[in-house]
Amino acid sequence: MNKKDYYWAKYMLIFGFFCISFGTSIFLKTEHAPDEAMRMLIPEYIVSHHTLPNGMEESVRHPLWGFSYALYPYLTAIISSVFMAITSLFTKSAAALLTAARLTSVLSGTGTLIVVFLIGEELFERRESALLSGIFVGFLPQFVFLSCYVNNDSFAVFTVALIIYFWIRGMKSAFCKKDCIGLGAGCGLCALSYYNAYAYLLCSILLFFALMIHFRKPAKEIFVKALAVFAIAFLIGGWFFIRNAVIHDGDLLGMRTSNESASLYAADEYKPENRQTPASEGWSFQQTYLQTPEGRTSNWLFSTVSSFIGSFSYMTVHLPMVLYLLYGALMAFGFLVFLFLGMVPHWFRKKPQLLLFVMLFLACLVTLFMDMYNTYFSDYQSQGRYLMPALVPLMVWIDDGYSSLTAKLPAEWKRASCHLTLLPGAVWLVLFLISYIGFLIPGCCMAS
């Protein structure tokens, strides 16, 4: 693929994604936007009071659950409040203010797509492979849905993509000044996104020191660069946790205070001490993750995988089984080919690439473990959005699989190789349009 065609396709995909997500954010009904009403309490409070909530105010506390999302990082709410304040200068329409608040998620999703293209350009020699990564990430139905309403998930994926991008650049430059600044910024933003993305903070530390030792950098340089990354991350993200600790008696993460608040103010059946969990019921691994609980239509595994692909509203608007199977087949085939053709030559033969692969895999594994742990011990949730921090690495590997397969074609098939590499992307876009037009729009934007 020549450079002109690549950039034309790239910018059209970015523009198309923005138009789809922004357009959907205008018409998406609030009752089909999970937890949005509870999250909207924070930017509404900021706009009304011109100050940040501490999380214990009644006006930001959910009457049923008894706690507030203001106890957890809420940078997205602060950004939304800025958009709402600007919009309020022109109109007081509730619909316009809601659309303004949703713009944070729209821009987070668009930003993710831009960064994923940059990741593809750094990782792959062929431009069509970079294009494929963006298609796989940006046009997954669930990711588009998350980019249309007020939540922390799309912003968390954006920060993860940013961190991975600077991992790759740092792998090539031994973390030059620009890459240290970029990694620090990514980590600081990630800290203010969602706890399920924190695996990338841990892996950033491990990868940074592993690469610096591999490049045999002097101890002084390692210390100075590590300090720079930490300082930038702390300047961006540290304020919230210090504020939490001061206000809530040392509770940096807000989790203890959240439980105490829920115990005091939640409806009886939602108080932490009364909440039934697989752990309190003594369920086995099989009962928790593989068997279908009473009152549910599918087990944890299927529900999580299907809602990672696309399950809208409060997981009540589903795609037909054939679409889940087609998406699953596309992903499974690409990943299997990656394991056999792409993993060893592209990721295992040079130590920096191996270290990058290990950290990406570890981050995905920790993300999965955290979700499974929370499901068993805290709150049974079979939602694919909790695994969204694994989206970018997973799709990059699937892309690598398809690219490795077409790279095996004979030299005289070079032109066909480009089209065949993009074929899975074309199929993916067709499946997305079917999912979007046939199910997301009727189920969440037009339903009464």
Predicted segments, located by residue:
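Start-transfer (signal-anchor) and selected internal transmembrane alpha helices
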Residues: M1-G23, M212-I213, I222-I232, W347-L360, ...
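Transmembrane signal-anchor helices characteristic of membrane glycosylation enzymes that use polyprenol
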Residues: D5-E36, E44-P53, L64, V229-V246, ...
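Short helix- or helix-capping micro-motifs
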Residues: F17, S133-G138, C187-A191
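Loop-to-helix entry region of an early transmembrane alpha helix in multi-pass inner-membrane enzymes
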Residues: A70, Y74-I78, L89-G111
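Transmembrane-helix motifs of polytopic, lipid-linked glycan transferases
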Residues: T99-F124, L162
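Perimembrane helix-loop-helix junctions
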Residues: R169-K172, Y200-F234, V246-I247
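Membrane-interface alpha helices of multi-pass inner-membrane proteins
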Residues: D179-Y195
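Membrane-lumen/periplasm interface segments of specific transmembrane helices
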Residues: V224-F338, S435-P442
